[in-house]
Amino acid sequence: MLKRLLIAACTLLFAGSLLAATPAAKPHVLIATSLGEIEVELDPAKAPISVKNFLEYVDSGYYDGTLFHRVIPGFMVQTGGFSAGMQEKKTRAPIKNEADNGLLNERGTLAMARTGVVDSATSQFFINLTDNDFLNHGARDFGYAVFGKVVRGMGVVDQIAKVPTTRRNGFADVPSDDVVILSAKRL
């Protein structure tokens, strides 16, 4: 009897240590757009700051009603900073650039958009339409931090990439007809 209890206790301890060693689940977010749904998987193990930042914007409803404001076929589609009429949305403080995390700017990945200042990313992000090696860390500068990937709805992303664009309010590559994030929610 004592032997069985000892075996059961050891088994429980071993199972507990296995569970503790299991990496945290990768959060999924459903981005419902005016052209369809895009499901993304985030990588908090490799991009903890970017993922935390993105999820804070998602959870607050910040992305709801946000435009895809920069669409460049064969390159990327960008969103996260403007509402209807190209009105710039207020953001939180910039975050540290995690482009040195080993994740690459490959087709279907999400990366933080930024200015020429390395640590200037806030709410804007883009989805790569192709492998954009020149955006990777060290390719030409610090790079652009990848923090997730599209797991469903890449056809919607490709559809966004095909919309006609124009200049609007001093911005180039803006869709002629608004492409809008209707909602972004954790799954």
From Swiss-Prot:
This enzyme catalyses: [protein]-peptidylproline (omega=180) = [protein]-peptidylproline (omega=0)
A Gene Ontology biological process in which this protein takes part is: protein folding
Which InterPro entries did the record assign?
A: Cyclophilin-like_dom_sf, Cyclophilin-type_PPIase_CS, Cyclophilin-type_PPIase_dom, E_coli_cyclophilin_A-like
Q: Which family does it belong to?
A: Belongs to the cyclophilin-type PPIase family.
Q: Which Gene3D superfamilies match?
A: Cyclophilin-like
Species this chain originates from: Pseudomonas aeruginosa (strain ATCC 15692 / DSM 22644 / CIP 104116 / JCM 14847 / LMG 12228 / 1C / PRS 101 / PAO1)
Protein name per the record: Peptidyl-prolyl cis-trans isomerase A
Q: Does the keyword Signal apply?
A: yes
Boundaries of every PPIase cyclophilin-type domain copy:
25-186
